[in-house]
UniProtKB/Swiss-Prot annotation:
Its EC number is 3.6.1.41. It comes from the Bacteria. This is Bis(5'-nucleosyl)-tetraphosphatase, symmetrical. The gene is apaH. Signal peptide: none annotated. Disulfide bonds: none annotated. It is an enzyme of class 3 (hydrolase). Belongs to the Ap4A hydrolase family. It catalyses: P(1),P(4)-bis(5'-adenosyl) tetraphosphate + H2O = 2 ADP + 2 H(+). Hydrolyzes diadenosine 5',5'''-P1,P4-tetraphosphate to yield ADP.
Amino acid sequence: MATYLVGDLQGCYDELQRLLEKVQFDSTQDQLYLVGDLVARGDKSLECLRFVKSLGKSAKTVLGNHDLHLISTALGIKKVKVRDRVDAIFHAPDFEELIDWLRHQPLLVHNEQQNFLMTHAGISPDWDLATAKQCAHEVENVLRHGDYHNLIENMYENRPDRWHDDLQGLDRLRYSINVFTRMRFCYWDHRLDFDCKLPPESAPEELTPWFNLANPLYQTIPIVFGHWASLVNTTTPNNIYALDTGCVWGNRMTMLRWEDKQYFSQHAVKNYRDF
């Protein structure tokens, strides 16, 4: 039995299948963990959703910003972006089933047996483990059982951009969603920045990657995430595993076997920006 973690799919189904063939993935024994953003911009988002869903308990994924946006468009809150190439999902006979399945996925996964955390974008520098799990649970509970339409309709804002223990209601939920699915850089006072997507070495000096800020949690338990393709040539601290290597931009898809920390990669079959 092996545990594999893979970076953002974003509709790059063929590359995922080639990676799984390389490692001889066996869904009856192995586990596949996905860092979110299963959909958007690649040309096989429908196939990605169906495949991950079909794996059942052999796969665990978290919600990314593109996944949440897909739910938003399914609810009629936002319009479909042509560049996202998700039309096939909306015309699929299992469309509603897929969206319902996606809505029930977590924002944070804690594998206690193998000692790692997985989320799409990261974990707030102001959170300990208990707070991170609580904040994820609060959002997940609304998405699964509450007024998820209202939550998704109100998630498209950048405020609040800093954590306070007394945050409540939509402000608290929005901050959590932004941390788990959108965060890259922070200011030194831990305010979130949502504009810069550059590699750290090219960013304004007032910004620092979230994982370089002081938080004992970052040294206590390994954190696996995606979302930030421009980290592809950046060395991250020990315990920080960045798996998005920009397959959808014509680079490669990366997979990590957790037991021996061996990496596997598959070059993009095409540059999806050109289609």
